[in-house]
C-alpha cells in the first residue's frame, strides 16, 4: 500500500506537486490561462466598442472597473504568498476567542458546524514549512483554512462587482430610453410646443396641476406626497418637458434643436464613472462591516437598513425639488407665455451641492452590492443554514431588501438624479467637450469664408452670456456651443448638438 518516495495513495492524504502527473498540471494550467485570456479579450472588445461609439464616459468607467479588479488581484496575491506567515502569528487566547462570527457551539446538533472546506483544505501553498505552533495560552491569529475562505471572498467581490455594475447601467439606460418618445415628440412639434403666442393660466399647465394641490400647502404632507410619488411614477411627461424647456432656456440659445434625452443619457454615463469606483472610504466601510459582524450583536441587521432608507430619502428629495419648482412658478406668475419656465439653481439641493446626492447613491449601491455578495459567499462556504444565518427569516428579508434597493436605485433614483441635477446652476462640460471643438471650428470656417467674400459681412460673435435663471460661467464650453449658429444647409448633416450615437 505504501508508495515509494514522496508518493501516496488515496488513503494517505493529498499528493504534492512532485508526485502529480505532468499532464494533469499542464491541463489545469492551460484551462486557467485560456479562461483568463478570453476574459481579457472580452473586456478589451467591450472597450473597443465604447471607443468606436464615442462612449467616453463608459470607457472610463470600464477602465475604473479594470483598476478595481487589479486591486482585488493584488489582495489575492498578498493573501496567497503571505498566508503561511500570517497563519504563524499568535495572539493571546482571550483575544483569539473574542468577537467571533459564530458562537462556540452554534449548530444544528448543538455542535459547532465546520465549513465544508475544512476537511480538504489542510494543505500548504507556495511554501514547504507548516505554520509555527503557538505556545500554551496562545492561538493562531487566523488559520490557513480561514485565509482560503477570505481568498474566496475576494473572488466573489470581483465577480459581483462586475455583475452589479452592468446591472446598474442597464437598468438606468432602460429607464432613460423610455423618455425617447417624449423627446421625439417635442422635436417634431417644436414650434407648437414652444409657441410664444400661447398664453395660459399657471394653474392650467400640466406641470403645475400635477404638483400643486392641497397636500402641498403643509410641508409634512408635501414630503409624504413626494415619498409615494417616486415609487408610483417618478418622471411624468410634463416633468420631462418642463425641465427640458428650463435647461435649454437657461443654458442654450432659444429655438436651438437639442436632443435633451441624449444629453441625459450621456450625463448618466458620466455619473456611472463615479458609482462603479471603490474609494478608500468604501474599503474602510468593508472593514467596519466585518469587524462588527459579531455573533449576537445584530449590528449588520441595522446596517442593512441604511441603503433602503437613504434611497427613499433621496428619491423623496428629488421629487420635492420638482414640486418646489412648480410651486415657484405658481407664486411668480398668474399667466405664462409658452411653456412654464423653472428656476434653475443649486439651492434646491442639500447644502447647494448636487454632487453630494451622487456620492450618497454611490455609497448605497456599493453597500447593497457588498451585502448581497456577502450573503452568497456565506451560502457557498458555510451553507444556507449556517450559524451566520441563525435567524433565517431575517436573512431572507435582508436579501429581498437588497434586490429591491438595487432595482429602485438603478432604475428610478439614479435616472431621476441625472434628470433633476440638470436643474442645477451648471452643466456638465465633459458631455460637450468634443462638440464644442467641432462647433468652434465650423464657426471659424464660416467666418473666414464670409470675410473673404465681397459684400458679405462677418457672422456675429457667439453670444457668451448665459440667459437669466442660473449662475453659470459665462464662457463655459456649453454656452459657446449653444450659441454657435447652425446654417440651415448644415442641419441635414447635424440635426442637433448631440448628434453622435
Curated annotation (Swiss-Prot):
Q: What is known of its domains?
A: The C-terminus contains a calmodulin-binding domain, which binds calmodulin in a calcium-dependent fashion.
- Tree of life domain: Eukaryota
Where composition is biased (Polar residues), the residues are: 491-501
What are the UniProt keywords, alphabetically?
Calmodulin-binding, Membrane, Pathogenesis-related protein, Plant defense, Transmembrane, Transmembrane helix
Q: What do the Gene Ontology cellular component annotations say?
A: plasma membrane
Q: What the protein does?
A: May be involved in modulation of pathogen defense and leaf cell death. Activity seems to be regulated by Ca(2+)-dependent calmodulin binding and seems not to require heterotrimeric G proteins.
Q: Which Pfam families match?
A: Mlo
The transmembrane residues are: 23-43, 69-89, 152-172, 274-294, 296-316, 360-380, 392-412
Protein name as catalogued: MLO-like protein 5
Region listing for Calmodulin-binding, in residue ranges: 450-471
Extracellular topology: which positions? 1-22, 90-151, 295, 381-391
Q: What InterPro entries is this protein classified in?
A: Mlo (IPR004326)
**What ranges are annotated Cytoplasmic (topological domains)?**
44-68, 173-273, 317-359, 413-501
Organism taxonomic ancestry = Eukaryota, Viridiplantae, Streptophyta, Embryophyta, Tracheophyta
Family as reported in the entry's similarity comment: Belongs to the MLO family.
Q: Where in the cell is it found?
A: Membrane
| Gene Ontology MF terms | calmodulin binding
Query: Biological process GO annotation list?
Result: defense response; pollen tube guidance; protein localization to plasma membrane
UniProt-annotated stretches for the region Disordered:
443-501
- What membrane topology does the annotation report for this chain? Multi-pass membrane protein
